[in-house]
From Swiss-Prot:
It comes from Homo sapiens. One of its GO terms (molecular function) is N-acetylgalactosaminyl-proteoglycan 3-beta-glucuronosyltransferase activity. Pfam families: CHGN (PF05679). This is Chondroitin sulfate synthase 1. It is linked to Temtamy preaxial brachydactyly syndrome: A syndrome characterized by multiple congenital anomalies, intellectual disability, sensorineural deafness, talon cusps of upper central incisors, growth retardation, and bilateral symmetric digital anomalies mainly in the form of preaxial brachydactyly and hyperphalangism. It is found in: Golgi apparatus, Golgi stack membrane; Secreted. Ubiquitous, with the highest levels in placenta. Detected at low levels in brain, heart, skeletal muscle, colon, thymus, spleen, kidney, liver, adrenal gland, mammary gland, stomach, small intestine, lung and peripheral blood leukocytes. The gene is CHSY1. Belongs to the chondroitin N-acetylgalactosaminyltransferase family. It is a single-pass type II membrane protein. Its EC number is 2.4.1.175, 2.4.1.226.
Length: 802
């Protein structure tokens, strides 16, 4: 027996040693490899700020600092090598714009140029800024910048004439798509004298005052001017004469006159140039391009003006998002090609290829029972009509859906007009007559749109005819991608695991070198939770049975797992609360059972008012405290507490979860024993409170910033809608999502007729919504009133639980 016991202990010890060695060889090297791969960007609500911060840490062309790069120098974003001696771009700027517009241009579009970008400013300009600045001798920042423009062209000629094929004069408030510009210029012969840009003749008021002969023009300077090497070679030797013989104060007019006079060419007469070199002609000129979801923005090579740097970054971010969309679409096409070729090659299709490569069809998802059928929503240009439980029958089109429709229509029109030139016609979008939409969670969004279009024929017999067409569209979901919220540090990971565990005192020191992890032991110390403390505020008056259930859930969710929370019960002392003594006694029992738990009762005087209670409770905390406004008829999980922390950002974002509300169990289960599981989510058991805002995670500082609760609101309702409106008006972000970790447990609803009429109406509406689903109520009515109705045809489906 002793030998057998020793063998058993040796087997256990050998298993432990082998397990630790394998963990050391496999887990930690992988973690170290991830660390060496470089830090990953955080997927936080401050995504845009993080990107700007990263950009602000990047330097320029002088010293060791370099600008923020979207891809390595000398490489194409599509993966191929780039010719870095193709295009030279000279950007005209001024000393006062070096730190703003010039830096924004350098950190955004300049990295896409297949060549060199330099910024030209006045003599004596600050060259310590993180961009390549050229101070032009004898030039100041006076406006109009005629001398600056000519001297910049001379600098290009003297230093780079034989090094680049094309030369561009640009403003510091322009945005240039380097890849599209390269494709356009490579279709032309740079050996010929070519002068490119948006053709200009002057404004209506300037007609006849620019010294232009009939048939003469100039290239407008705002969207950018491009000239071939031959034009620069012919013109620059005569710049002195051009400067002495100027007829207007317009710099671009005089450059065009000089080119026409000495290079023998002028700005190309082409309607297409107006689209490629885009100038924003809005009546209320604000100095930036506001509407980005526009086909003109997509077709253009240059965009002007964007005088405010934040709008330059906004435009650049949008262009990158379009690039990402194109790449995702390309991956979907490749998956479809893989599926197609696998049929011919008789090879096995991977699950991912089968999921993403399925051909477009409205029948990709095959429902097996009635409850699984995906219903369509009807839409017009302004409204969305829905039969989904919990949604109003008609609601206004929200901004996100309207933007999605605009983007879809824009893509459809681009596809329709792809070969408009060869066909001699162009089709313009007029409006959406009506349509249908639905979202298939497995595959993507689906649309059927009835479009009113204008058919314009410009070849042969010209004509304009209104036409209607049906468009059947699918936006396929691409592959799911996960991003680390934080970078993985192998040493920190091992340190944290060791701190939370005991030591391997029964192993030798040599073994500890191979095994950086430790097993739990008797010496482990109690660690205080590092999660942000959540202060749970519950207004309470009566409802003792609900309070007992709430405290049972609170014990299981927070007290036993030692969650970092504080419970504040806001107890009303009015005579209408007969359960006050029992509630105080229950809290005393829990404090005795859990002496280290942070729980308190805060008395509130007067008649019940949720707004007053939460205002009194929140006043006990500082501005950095995280508050959770809760109700006694809720149950929640530990996972929700983590989402409450993650989705609430001080000074930026408030979390308004959309909670699940149970229907009346007597109706749901038809007299049978109700399920004890509150977290059963089906159309039969409950509905999502899309228009309820009472459950909130918010920092005290943000509550103060928006103005707090309206304590004049008495009784039931309205205080949550009022707070939500204040948050929106204060400019803070609201994060809303279905929250599977919070459930409103059904209870009978009593609506006091003495309430304010608006509150009373809302209460009655809420009460009516809690009886049961529309389908089940209809079935109950049919059972009683229609003898021919057979419930056997109805399949209730399976209950999905969380």
């Amino acid at each position: 027996m002793a030998a057998r016991g020793r063998r058993a202990w040796l087997s256990v010890l050998l298993g432990l040693v082998l397990g630790f060695v394998l963990a050391s060889r496999l887990v930690l090297p992988r973690a170290s490899e991830l660390k060496r791969a470089g830090p990953r960007r955080r997927a936080s609500p401050e995504g845009c700020r993080s990107g700007q911060a990263a950009a602000s840490q990047a330097g320029g062309a002088r010293g060791d600092a370099r600008g923020a790069q979207l891809w390595p120098p000398g490489s194409d974003p599509d993966g191929g090598p780039r010719d870095r001696n193709f295009l030279f771009v000279g950007v005209m700027t001024a000393q006062k714009y070096l730190q703003t517009r010039a830096v924004a241009a350098y950190r955004t579009w300049s990295k896409t140029i297949p060549g060199k970008v330099q910024f030209f400013s006045s003599e004596g300009s600050d060259t310590s800024v993180p961009i390549p600045v050229v101070p032009l001798r004898g030039v100041d920042d006076s406006y109009p910048p005629q001398k600056k423009s000519f001297m910049m062209l001379k600098y290009m000629h003297d230093h780079y004439l034989d090094k680049y094929e094309w030369f561009m004069r640009a403003d510091d408030d322009v945005y240039i798509k380097g890849d599209r510009l390269e494709n356009f210029l490579r279709s032309l012969n740079s050996s010929e004298p070519l002068f490119l840009g948006q053709t200009g003749l002057g404004t209506t008021e300037e007609m006849g005052k620019l010294a232009l002969e009939p048939g003469e023009n100039f290239c407008m300077g705002g969207p950018g001017v491009i000239m071939s090497r031959e034009v620069l070679r012919r013109m620059v030797p005569h710049i002195g004469k051009c400067l002495r013989e100027m007829y207007t104060t317009h710099e671009d007019v005089e450059v065009g006159r000089c080119v026409r006079r000495f290079a023998g060419v002028q700005c190309v007469w082409s309607y297409e140039m107006q689209q490629l070199f885009y100038e924003n002609y809005e009546q209320n000129k604000k100095g930036y391009i506001r509407d980005l979801h526009n086909s003109k923005i997509h077709q253009a090579i240059t965009l002007h003006p964007n005088k405010n740097p934040p709008y330059q970054y906004r435009l650049h971010s949008y262009m990158l998002s379009r690039k990402i969309s194109e790449l995702r679409h390309r991956t979907i096409q490749l998956h479809r090609e893989i599926v197609l070729m696998s049929k011919y090659s008789n090879t096995e299709i991977h699950k991912e290829d089968l999921q993403l490569g399925i051909p477009p069809s409205f029948m990709r998802f095959q429902p097996r029972q009635r409850e699984e059928i995906l219903e369509w929503e009807f839409l017009t240009g302004k409204y969305l009509y829905s039969a989904v439980d919990g949604q109003p029958p008609r609601r206004g089109m929200d901004s996100a859906q309207r933007e999605a429709l605009d983007d879809i229509v824009m893509q459809v029109m681009e596809m329709i007009n792809a070969n408009a030139k060869t066909r001699g016609r162009i089709i313009d979008f007029k409006e959406i007559q009506y349509g249908y939409r639905r979202v298939n969670p497995m595959y993507g969004a689906e649309y059927i749109l009835d479009l009113l279009l204008l058919y314009k024929k410009h070849k042969g017999k010209k004509m304009t005819v209104p036409v209607r067409r049906h468009a059947y569209l699918q936006q396929t979901f691409s592959k799911i991608q996960f991003v680390e919220h934080e970078e993985l540090d192998a040493q920190e990971l091992a340190k944290r695991i060791n701190q939370e565990s005991g030591s391997l005192s029964f192993l030798s020191n040599s073994l500890k070198k191979l095994v950086p992890f430790q097993l739990p032991g008797s010496k482990s110390e109690h660690k205080e939770p590092k999660d942000k403390k959540i202060n749970i505020l519950i207004p309470l008056s009566g409802r003792f049975d609900m309070f007992v259930r709430f405290m049972g859930n609170f014990e299981k969710t927070c007290l036993i797992p030692n969650q970092n929370v504080k419970l504040v019960v806001l107890l009303f002392n009015s005579d209408s609360n007969p359960d006050k003594a029992k509630q105080v006694e229950l809290m005393r029992d829990y404090r005795i059972k859990y002496p280290k738990a942070d729980m308190q009762i805060l008395p509130v005087s007067g008649e019940f008012s949720r707004a007053l209670a939460l205002e009194v409770g929140s006043s006990q905390f500082n501005n950095e405290s995280l508050l959770f406004f809760c109700d006694v008829d809720l149950v929640f999980t530990t996972e929700f507490l983590q989402r409450c922390r993650a989705n609430t950002v001080l000074g930026q974002q408030i979390y308004f979860p959309i909670i699940f509300s149970q229907y009346d169990p007597k109706i749901v289960y038809s007299g049978k024993v109700p399920s004890d599981n509150h977290f059963a989510f089906t159309q039969k058991t409950g509905f999502w409170r899309n228009y309820g805002f009472g459950i909130t995670c918010i920092y005290k500082g943000d509550l103060v910033r928006v103005g707090g609760f309206d304590v004049s609101i008495q009784g039931w309702g309205l205080e949550d809608v009022d707070l939500f409106n204040k948050v929106v008006q204060a400019g803070l972000k609201t994060f809303r999502s279905q929250e599977v970790g919070v459930v409103h447990v059904h209870h009978p609803v009593f609506c006091d007729p003495n309430l304010d009429p608006k509150q009373y109406k809302m209460c009655l509406g809420s009460k009516a919504s809690t009886y049961g689903s529309t389908q089940q109520l209809a079935e109950m009515w049919l059972e009683k009133n229609d003898p021919s109705y057979s419930k056997s045809s109805n399949n209730n489906g399976s209950v999905r639980t969380a």
